[in-house]
Amino acid sequence: MSEENPVFQIQRVYLKDLSLEQPNSPQILLEQEQPNVDIQLGVEAAPVADGIFEVAVTATVQTKIKDKTVFLVEAKQAGIFEIRNIPEDQMGPIMGIACPQIVYPYLRGNIADVITRAGFPPVHLAEINFQAMYEQQQSQLASAAPTPGVTQ
């Protein structure tokens, strides 16, 4: 009977990749103008073994003054999850919503920390509604898919 019980366990959360670039330092540090901040997020999921999945949240934080980069941080925080005996129609939401919600706070902390250690005021990533993000991705995929029976 226990073989059929749903299993959802965090095996590990880890920082998979982190890079910081300051291509225009030290000159750019003398600028008085406020930089523009651009933040891009993404979620990836992949099977690792039977019932074991890696879910990663990536973030790119780029600050610029005019057309010059002040700093660029790219980070990928990942988690290994054991997910078994879950109905197939629930796997997408688990890996696209539940797992990223677990991993994301670690990513936020690591990004704020590396930016601060680089000598800049921290950039705090906002809370993310992963359900809305997942639903938007699903609707984009649905609208991009050809309609059955319709030829183009």
Swiss-Prot record:
<dbReference type="GO" id="GO:0005737">
    <property type="term" value="C:cytoplasm"/>
</dbReference>
<dbReference type="GO" id="GO:0051262">
    <property type="term" value="P:protein tetramerization"/>
</dbReference>
<comment type="subunit">
    <text>Homotetramer, a dimer of dimers. One homotetramer interacts with 1 SecA dimer.</text>
</comment>
<comment type="similarity">
    <text>Belongs to the SecB family.</text>
</comment>
<protein>
    <recommendedName>
        <fullName>Protein-export protein SecB</fullName>
    </recommendedName>
</protein>
<keyword id="KW-0963">Cytoplasm</keyword>
<keyword id="KW-0813">Transport</keyword>
<dbReference type="GO" id="GO:0051082">
    <property type="term" value="F:unfolded protein binding"/>
</dbReference>
<keyword id="KW-0143">Chaperone</keyword>
<dbReference type="InterPro" id="IPR003708">
    <property type="entry name" value="SecB"/>
</dbReference>
<dbReference type="InterPro" id="IPR035958">
    <property type="entry name" value="SecB-like_sf"/>
</dbReference>
<dbReference type="GO" id="GO:0006457">
    <property type="term" value="P:protein folding"/>
</dbReference>
<dbReference type="Pfam" id="PF02556">
    <property type="entry name" value="SecB"/>
</dbReference>
<comment type="function">
    <text>One of the proteins required for the normal export of preproteins out of the cell cytoplasm. It is a molecular chaperone that binds to a subset of precursor proteins, maintaining them in a translocation-competent state. It also specifically binds to its receptor SecA.</text>
</comment>
<keyword id="KW-0653">Protein transport</keyword>
<dbReference type="GO" id="GO:0015031">
    <property type="term" value="P:protein transport"/>
</dbReference>
<keyword id="KW-0811">Translocation</keyword>
